[in-house]
């Protein structure tokens, strides 16, 4: 998550790049690979008994075809590995169009907007809440 090509895209103005990153207890991580090649990481945070939040960190070299191939595997992996999961949600700042398109292609529906709730480059942005429920599939 601290990769120099990823961290600037997922951090707000008040989150400087840490010297190191330590996995948090209670989180579930899924390394996205193509053979031995690391493409990125999915981080899942349990929000309550049935909802998990996903954070997607795909390296620039993997964006496009490889990322979408991995995306097709995500729902089945999540339902099999995230205990009690009935819904997966994510929050995407409105300026991050590629992340929004990626979430929508994952089959996520737009649930709503949290207005002016993310500070990036000195500007406030809306945050879009999206999610997918068990039984729904990638588009």
Each language-model region and where it sits:
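Conserved acetyl-CoA-binding loop-helix of GNAT-fold acetyltransferases
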Residues: 64-80, 101, 105
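Conserved catalytic-core motifs of GNAT/GCN5-like acyltransferases
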Residues: 91, 109-125
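Active-site rim helix/loop that mediates acceptor-substrate recognition in acyltransferases
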Residues: 10-27
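Conserved acetyl-CoA binding element of GNAT-fold acetyltransferases
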Residues: 49-61, 91
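Conserved beta-strand in the GNAT
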Residues: 36-46, 52-53
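Conserved beta-hairpin
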Residues: 26-40
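Conserved active-site alpha-helix within GNAT-family acetyltransferase domains
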Residues: 95-112
């Amino acid at each position: 998550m601290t990769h120099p090509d990823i961290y600037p895209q997922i951090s707000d103005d008040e989150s400087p790049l840490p010297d190191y990153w330590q996995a948090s207890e209670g989180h579930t991580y899924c390394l996205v690979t193509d053979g031995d090649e690391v493409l990125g990481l999915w981080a899942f945070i349990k929000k309550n008994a049935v909802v998990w939040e996903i954070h997607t960190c795909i390296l620039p070299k993997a964006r496009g075809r490889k990322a979408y191939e991995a995306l097709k595997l995500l729902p089945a992996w999540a339902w099999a590995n995230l205990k009690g999961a009935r819904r997966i949600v994510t929050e995407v700042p409105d300026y991050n169009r590629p992340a929004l398109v990626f979430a929508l292609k994952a089959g996520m529906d737009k649930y709503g907007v949290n207005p002016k709730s993310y500070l990036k480059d000195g500007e406030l942005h809306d945050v879009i809440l999206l999610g997918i429920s068990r039984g729904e599939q990638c588009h």
